[in-house]
Amino acid sequence: MRAPIKKIFTFDPFKKNEERQIHQVQNLIWGEWTKELKENEEILDPVSGEVFLRVPNTTDFSEYIKNFDKCPKSGLHNPIKNPERYLMLGEVSRNASRILKEKSVEQYFCKLIQRVMPKSKSQCLGEVEVTRVFLENFSGDNVRFLARSFSNPGNYLGQETSGYRWPFGSVCIIAPFNFPLEIPVLQVMGALFMGNRPLVKVDSKVSVVFEQFLRLLIHCGLPASDVDFINCKGEVMGELIKRSKNQIRLLQFTGSKEVAQRLSLETFGKIKIEDAGFDWKIIGPDYDPKWTKHVAWQCDEDAYNASGQKCSAQSFLFVHKNWEKDLLPRLKELASKRKLENLDVGPILTWTNQQIIEHINCLLTIPGSKILFGGKKLLNNTIPPIYGSFQPTALEIPIDKILGDNFKKITKEVFGPFQIIVVYEDKNMQIVKKTLENISQNLTAAVVSNDVLFQQEILASTVNGTTYSGMKARTTGAPQNHWFGPSGDPRSAGIGTPEAIISTWSSHREIIKDVGPL
């Protein structure tokens, strides 16, 4: 690392895994980085299998709970209290985006992400760019514009009603492993912008990324006491939430549907969720050979980038019969070109090979189902056995076997390079729409068609929060310039845009001024 970077960051991702280079991740509590840590979890490099990180296994969280009481429910700031903090956070965003634009810092985070969540350089770079542009968007006055209020005339002289966006106060953020920079940074900044004080827990496998970015934010002027950062096991975090559920005003969770449901009950519904997505794409009847190459490329990108470890990854692909002969061979060819050498396919951090094989074998018991391509382990690698390493895989299931007893196992989300493909015809549209209606997760979707009537039929019948429509439609790659999040659930959390921040991180407050005269 260059000298200026060393002043900010404490871990060098460019150095090889030598004993002296094992990095100790630290917690941040009320502005102080922890110095002495007795219990740690050793994190293996997902590619080489060597230990390269030590992450605190925090078990005593009493101080974190005490800190919840240090932030009132009116927040660190609101439209009436401490408004100068809106300006301060705009300046922090400006400074952070400027530094993140420097090539050396951009490459630092790109490499750091790749070390803990191995994916292609372009995927890592895209995550850094989205984060940087988000910070640019909320530089200067745009933070206070998030808290814009409105007024309506009263019934008589001296009466006026005003609507405000109000913070929750002490909040909690739990972020996953698959986007170790983008997700925690965008949610933490959104929480701060609206006046909240967050406690942040990021998956321990990748938490070093947020640790380093938090150091950058503090370097850029963020008060170190504005955020608490804890590293611990999931069950410990669950116990922390259980013991402080009356003090946590809001929990924002990004992760699996099962954990989201448990936390929803634990917090009495004080939760905003961006849960796992079994995301579908439907390719319409308007086959056009000049579009096949692009449609195939986008399907491959959506299903297998980051080894399918995206909550927006294409899990269920409906292919109209008109496209079948031209499209499916192209998908197989594209998948075969993905190599571990450039991390177009790589370690799977939450599924083992055995779990994937068992799921495939379960699906193959469905009459007529078959593997179209893939279905085997990656060979000749040093990926540790606690992680998966699997070829990009597609399994075809007959359209008439989707509904009924098989539905639950067919729609089980595999957080890896795996998708279900179903070929359908016009006469099957009721089955297709019934399938989409029954899928419980409504994050992303794509309607790949320029047939306006077909678009209307599908869009009118579905609820996915981020839906792309048209021949260039995708399920992944959401930038910072549009809403990303599920729909159809009052607990849905958004990310990236002013609407997402306002919806997720503030509530409506009405103040009626009634001053007379008599």
Please provide the spans of the model-predicted regions.
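Residue-level signal for inorganic ion chemistry
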Residues: 31, 49, 195, 227, ...
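Conserved C-terminal structural/oligomerization subdomain of aldehyde/semialdehyde dehydrogenase
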Residues: 1, 50-53, 84-94, 202, ...
